[in-house]
Amino acid sequence: MKAISVLSGGLDSLVTSMVAKKENSEIATVTFNYGQMALDKELKSAKKISKVLGAENQVFDISFVKEFSKSGLNTGNIPNPKKDDLDDFKESEKTMKSVWVPARNMIMFSIASGFAEGINAEKIYSGLNKEEGVTFPDNSTEFINSFNKSLEYGTLNKVKMYAPLYNLDKVEIATFGKRLEDELGLDILKYSYSCYRDNLKDYLHCGTCESCMRRKRAFESAGIVDPTNYILQ
């Protein structure tokens, strides 16, 4: 069966792409340029991951969202939360709003659906997960179910989106990812890029943005060696 995986280059989308690789005979990956500050590093990561997985990587330009987005991911005004803030809903909600790109996931998944239908793929894999679903509404199970309902009417071949990590937090994702890496005989986790910033060097993370902090905590709490290089440990 043919499938596509939405691959930003981050840990969640990498693990999801490994699941897609395991479950399907042929996969392709799609990556999006929405004018994000970390674009170059994300593209580098996505291309490398795709090569290791033996998947063709397609990049779509949706940088027009910069015209109406005030997100820190586009402007560079990215907050550095405290570690204790990660489990504080009010503080996490503030961070979420500061990096929210209007309708980003809706736009990306709609394009991914069209691409999937065009190449006759039946599945779209996404890295939506439980931890981010707490604050990001477009990571929730409600979003997944609603989007799949729209696909029943919006595509002829009834493409369906799968989110294999929907019930996992970051610690569980890191654990699952390491198990998949070993099972598939790959050395690939080190190529993921989670940072909101472009730190000039490939795969180098700032260590202070929310995404980096959640990544660090995930590997540490899972008891797994973190393959990531951080500017600030």
Curated annotation (Swiss-Prot):
User: Superkingdom of this entry's organism?
Assistant: Archaea
List, in alphabetical order, the Gene Ontology terms for molecular function in this entry: ATP binding; ligase activity, forming carbon-nitrogen bonds; zinc ion binding
Report residues binding Zn(2+).
Answer: C195, C206, C209, C212
Return the SUPFAM superfamilies for the record.
Answer: Adenine nucleotide alpha hydrolases-like
Q: Give a yes or no for keyword ATP-binding in this entry.
A: yes
Tell me the cofactors it needs.
Answer: Zn(2+)
Q: Provide the E.C. number(s) assigned to this enzyme.
A: 6.3.4.20
| Assigned keywords, A-Z | ATP-binding, Ligase, Metal-binding, Nucleotide-binding, Zinc
Query: What does the record say about how the cofactor binds?
Result: Binds 1 zinc ion per subunit.
What residues does ATP bind to? L7, S8, G9, G10, L11, D12, S13, L14, V15, T16, S17
So what does this thing catalyse? 7-carboxy-7-deazaguanine + NH4(+) + ATP = 7-cyano-7-deazaguanine + ADP + phosphate + H2O + H(+)
Enzyme class comes to ligase
Q: Output the Pfam families linked to this UniProt entry.
A: QueC
Q: In which pathway does it act?
A: Purine metabolism; 7-cyano-7-deazaguanine biosynthesis
Q: Which InterPro entries match?
A: QueC, Rossmann-like_a/b/a_fold
Q: What does this protein do?
A: Catalyzes the ATP-dependent conversion of 7-carboxy-7-deazaguanine (CDG) to 7-cyano-7-deazaguanine (preQ(0)).
Q: Which family does it belong to?
A: Belongs to the QueC family.
Matching PANTHER family: 7-CYANO-7-DEAZAGUANINE SYNTHASE
**This protein's name:** 7-cyano-7-deazaguanine synthase
User: Which gene is the coding source of this polypeptide chain?
Assistant: queC
